[in-house]
Curated annotation (Swiss-Prot):
Binding locations of Fe cation 2: 71
EC number(s) recorded for this UniProt protein: 1.16.-.-
The family this protein is said to belong to: Belongs to the Dps family.
Domain of life: Bacteria
Description of how the protein assembles with itself and partners: Homododecamer.
Organism: Porphyromonas gingivalis (strain ATCC 33277 / DSM 20709 / CIP 103683 / JCM 12257 / NCTC 11834 / 2561)
Keywords assigned by UniProt, alphabetized: Cytoplasm, Iron, Metal-binding, Oxidoreductase
GO CC field: cytoplasm
Subcellular location: Cytoplasm
Regulation: induction: Constitutively expressed but is up-regulated by exposure to atomospheric oxygen in an OxyR-dependent manner.
Name recorded for this polypeptide: DNA protection during starvation protein
Length: 159
């Protein structure tokens, strides 16, 4: 059986930077996922009902994106990391523990999305240069939903 890169026509040396970018993104997404779970469990205050439900929707959606990123790494000949201890070494997104009010969790989410979206744009650019349209499409799809989410969260947070 041929390796996937032989079948797709992509070159290992060209997609290596894509795999590296996706691996970093995977680490950030995993930390973000963990933070969202904590926000969901620990949110307090008048916005509890709205944000408790919203954060659950967000981490459910994110679980699918994490799987897509890990599978794309495999499709490009890489091996996705699965150890949280390794994610923490390379992730730009940091673990959160004590955020429980609406304002602080919303700020963290929008700050995190800013980091993640910048990485996705960079990955899309590198993937485009490598002729990897599938990864470009994956990143554009993620960005589309995230930009809408940032707009909605910003509108919600505006007093």
């Amino acid at each position: 059986m041929k390796k996937i890169l032989e079948v797709t026509g992509l070159k290992e040396q060209q997609v290596a930077p894509v795999v590296k970018g996706l691996s970093g993104l995977l680490a950030d997404l995993q930390v973000y996922y963990s933070n969202l779970r904590g926000f969901h469990w620990n949110i307090r205050g008048a916005e509890f009902f709205v944000l408790h439900e919203q954060y659950e929707k967000m981490y459910d959606d994110l679980a699918g994106k994490i799987d897509e990123v890990a599978e794309r790494i495999l499709q490009l000949g890489g091996k996705p990391e699965n150890r949280f201890s390794e994610y923490l070494k390379v992730a730009e997104v940091k673990e959160e523990h004590e955020l429980v009010c609406a304002a602080s969790t919303l700020k963290n989410v929008t700050d995190t999305l800013q980091i993640i979206m910048a990485k996705e744009r960079a990955i899309a650019e590198v993937a485009g240069e490598a002729g990897d349209e599938v990864t470009v499409d994956l990143m554009i799809g993620f960005l589309s939903g995230q930009e809408k989410l940032v707009w909605m969260l910003s509108a919600y947070a505006t007093k």
